Amino acid sequence: MAEKLHISVLCGGQSTEHEISIQSAKNIVNTLDAAKYLISVIFIDHVGRWYLIDQPEMFLAHSPDHLVKEGSARPITIAFGDAAKPWQSLNGDGRRYSADCVFPMVHGTQGEDGALQGLLELLNLPYVGANVQSSAVCMEKDLTKTVLRAGGIPVVDWHTLSPRDATEGVYQRLLDRWGTSELFVKAVSLGSSVATLPVKTETEFTKAVKEVFRYDDRLMVEPRIRGREIECAVLGNGAPKASLPGEIIPHHDYYSYDAKYLDPNGATTTTSVDLSESVTKQIQQIAIDAFKMVHCSGMARVDFFVTPNNKVLVNEINTIPGFTNISMYPKMWEASGLPCPNLLDQLIELAIDRHQEQQKLIRCYEVKARSL
């Protein structure tokens, strides 16, 4: 019988998406096949402290904060030098804990922006999802669009602002440029529609800019696209494949954080999408092309707008898509014939395969000094 792989699922973090991360991690832990894997959870609290939860059933039954308070979550630190045992106890015994592969499910800042991926690279650990560079590019929405547009991928137009930029007259210039007074002001590097605000007047625009700068040091403005919100899941490394598309039908004014996570009737999500075969194939091909363009690996969800005249526009790429029981990434793959347990198996296999390929690369180049 093959030895079980030890999978560490990372969640929490110092991010506005902390709670969503925990929901995603719970669904993954609940879905992973315990006959194949030894499962532990690494929880990062709001101030950045790390904890090990090695009883997955406790994690499923209680909040991580509750487990920390009662002592079931052990405080740990990062231990370099032994990739097989990267977690070290802070309880005084110095015990080290193993991991064969890490499944990062820390959404947003410090989890999806390359910071966590860089740490896992330094630990020489296989991990699920995009590498440092791809994570950083996709987290910065304006950089994502710059790269995609340069590669010929159609994107929603945008304008970027920093706190140093003067905002006087910007709204009118953008209105003239796009021919609409309806705009979105959003943080460049946040997800889940955090700090994303619709505006229709210059007064609302000025207020929104001030509000978004409370969350990020750069923001982007986009014209509001009156079209269908379509998503497509991508899976793979060198030869990625795309799922059947899904659709978000918001019941709020737009697909806000509240509509996504707080209001059970905030939106309808469906994997039975009424699109022509040609548009469906176009979405799938653009999703794969975008995935390759930013050198993603493992997984990503590509979000689109489809206009009334069937123009397909990429909105953003999410390298750690939600994995809650209502999240679209696993649902789209299930609709495409790949159930979530098998999807998780493939993601872990892809992570280990990529790590093994990386280990074959020459990292040190010895040059003999020429004698003088």
UniProtKB/Swiss-Prot annotation:
Its cofactor is Mg(2+); Mn(2+). Mg(2+) 1 binds at D303, E316. Binds 2 magnesium or manganese ions per subunit. One of its GO terms (cellular component) is cytosol. Keywords: ATP-binding, Cell shape, Cell wall biogenesis/degradation, Cytoplasm, Ligase, Magnesium, Manganese, Metal-binding, Nucleotide-binding, Peptidoglycan synthesis. It comes from the Bacteria. SUPFAM superfamilies: Glutathione synthetase ATP-binding domain-like (SSF56059), PreATP-grasp domain (SSF52440). One of its GO terms (molecular function) is D-alanine-D-alanine ligase activity. The keyword Repeat does not apply. It is an enzyme of class 6 (ligase). Pathway: Cell wall biogenesis; peptidoglycan biosynthesis. Mg(2+) 2 binds at E316, N318. The keyword rRNA processing does not apply. PROSITE patterns: ATP_GRASP, DALA_DALA_LIGASE_1, DALA_DALA_LIGASE_2. It is found in: Cytoplasm. It catalyses: 2 D-alanine + ATP = D-alanyl-D-alanine + ADP + phosphate + H(+). It holds the Pfam family Dala_Dala_lig_C. Cell wall formation. Belongs to the D-alanine--D-alanine ligase family. This is D-alanine--D-alanine ligase. It comes from Coxiella burnetii (strain RSA 493 / Nine Mile phase I).
